[in-house]
């Protein structure tokens, strides 16, 4: 026995569906408008989208054909499981019917409870014909505004307008020969004949069948074949002034803008740190990480994610430390200004020497053994460290900087201030408030080159 109220009950009782204004209500949507103007298959898709939007479903049409195909497979599998559960739990005859009008086979698929499944499959011809007629009555009329423009094929995949940047390599290889027929007016492209080569064909691509990539290995590494095929299509449409046939959906642009904004927002304090700043990381009790600038001791930023520290400071592994010769001058005045000027001079010397300079007369070379540590201090003096377990030197953080030598390798440079004692010798002054310590230098030797003020001084 059949319940009478179930015969014509709409699928959504609160919002009864009325197809009289099916497509007009969605013309304000850029995606639906382009779909409706592309032909019968696009009209079918636009009508389905309008149905979902009228019922307030929080979904949008997937413009990428590859992703759309994966979504179709996933949802069909879910529908089959749902219809089987419905038939088992409720005990009613129920089927799921999907079709694509306009294609040669209609892509007619039906599955569910028997015998209703077999009945619907036998009605395939009637269903497709009635559906084509219903969509044709509501499809927008084609406009003749572009009658004087050059005729080129629309970029459609399975009847759906598709952006050229989202077409797969196989789709591009199949589409370009069709595009050439419209562009050149010839039945065959004439591959390999320079006389048949279109003027818009990229000069750096060979005039050969696009089904195979005949470029050299170097050219293949520089530009992918898919990107080269996209360039061919864009050049053709721009040459003939048919940019209007290159579909670009507003939703895709919004997604790209949102993705770029999220990428920038992930590093909100990146511009707060100068490129030469030396920072010290402190793990706070609440799980955040604070960045302390060594020069001032002030907190630059506090990050919730410890992985952002590497992105902000751009830390590099210290494989080799080379300190270039620097003429030390003793003068009264602003010590910070002198240190800054000295660092700039040292950077110029390092760049000119290509990173490997020769020692000159009056220079003393000190070689630090394996396990030596370089310690940055907040003042401008130098001191040796030997606590029995490790040896090292202290370098003032105010003059610590990294430059790139001529060979492209990073060079750690420092301005070493030598304090002259009353006894005529030169010693390393005591260091206070050391705020940063680098990692030990494994299997490497750090060389410190210092210019002595006179022949009777020592380091």
From Swiss-Prot:
A Pfam family matched in the record: Nrf1_DNA-bind
GO biological process: regulation of transcription by RNA polymerase II
Residue numbers spanned by region Disordered: 1-25
Gene Ontology molecular functions: DNA-binding transcription factor activity, RNA polymerase II-specific; RNA polymerase II cis-regulatory region sequence-specific DNA binding
Membrane-spanning parts: none
Compartment(s) of residence: Nucleus
GO CC, alphabetical: nucleus
Principal location class: nucleus
Statement: the UniProt record of this protein carries the keyword Nucleus: yes
Keyword annotations of the record: DNA-binding, Nucleus, Transcription, Transcription regulation
PANTHER family membership: NUCLEAR RESPIRATORY FACTOR 1
Family, per entry: Belongs to the NRF1/Ewg family.
Biological function: Transcriptional regulator that interacts with specific sites in the control region of the cyIIIa actin gene. Also binds specifically to similar target sites located in the regulatory region of the SM50 gene.
Protein's name according to its UniProt entry: DNA-binding protein P3A2
Native species: Strongylocentrotus purpuratus (Purple sea urchin)
Source taxonomy: Eukaryota, Metazoa, Echinodermata, Eleutherozoa, Echinozoa
């Amino acid at each position: 026995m059949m319940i009478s109220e179930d015969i014509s009950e709409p699928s959504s009782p609160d919002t009864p569906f009325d197809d009289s204004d099916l497509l007009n209500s969605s013309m304000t949507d850029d995606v639906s408008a382009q779909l409706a103007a592309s032909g019968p298959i696009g009209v079918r898709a636009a009508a389905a989208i309008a149905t979902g939007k009228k019922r307030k479903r929080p979904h949008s049409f997937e413009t990428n054909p590859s992703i759309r195909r994966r979504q179709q497979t996933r949802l069909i599998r879910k529908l089959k499981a749902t219809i089987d559960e419905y038939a088992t739990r409720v005990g009613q005859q129920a089927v799921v019917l999907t079709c694509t009008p306009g294609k040669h086979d209609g892509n007619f698929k039906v599955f569910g409870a028997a015998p209703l499944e077999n009945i619907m499959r036998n009605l395939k011809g009637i269903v497709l014909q009635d559906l084509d007629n219903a969509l044709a009555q509501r499809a927008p009329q084609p406009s003749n505004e572009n009658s004087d423009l050059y005729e080129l094929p629309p970029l459609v995949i399975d009847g759906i307008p598709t952006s050229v940047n989202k077409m797969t390599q196989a789709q591009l290889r199949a589409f370009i020969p069709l595009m050439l027929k419209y562009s050149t007016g010839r039945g065959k492209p004439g591959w390999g004949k320079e006389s048949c080569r279109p003027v818009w064909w990229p000069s750096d691509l060979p005039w050969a069948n696009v089904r195979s990539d005949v470029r050299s290995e170097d050219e293949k590494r520089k530009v992918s074949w898919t990107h080269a095929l996209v360039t061919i299509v864009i050049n053709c449409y721009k040459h003939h002034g048919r940019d209007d046939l290159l579909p670009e959906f507003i939703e895709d642009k919004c997604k790209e803008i949102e993705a770029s904004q999220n990428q920038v927002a992930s590093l909100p304090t990146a511009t707060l740190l100068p490129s030469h700043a030396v920072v010290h990381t402190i793990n706070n009790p609440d799980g955040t990480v604070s960045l302390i600038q060594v020069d001032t001791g002030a907190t630059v930023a506090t990050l919730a994610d410890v992985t952002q520290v590497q992105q902000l400071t751009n830390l590099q592994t210290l494989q080799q430390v080379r300190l270039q010769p620097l003429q030390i001058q003793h003068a009264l005045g602003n010590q910070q200004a002198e240190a800054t000027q000295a660092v700039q001079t040292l950077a110029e010397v390092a760049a000119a020497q290509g990173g490997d300079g020769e020692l000159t007369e009056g220079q003393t070379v000190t070689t630090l053994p394996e396990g030596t540590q370089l310690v940055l201090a907040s003042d401008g003096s130098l001191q040796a460290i030997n606590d029995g377990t490790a040896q090292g030197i202290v370098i003032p953080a105010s003059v610590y900087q990294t430059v790139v030598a001529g060979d492209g390798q990073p060079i750690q440079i420092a301005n070493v201030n030598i304090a002259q004692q009353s006894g005529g010798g030169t010693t390393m002054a005591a260091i206070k408030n050391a705020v940063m310590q680098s990692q030990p230098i494994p299997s490497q030797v750090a060389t410190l080159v210092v210019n002595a003020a006179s022949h009777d001084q020592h380091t």
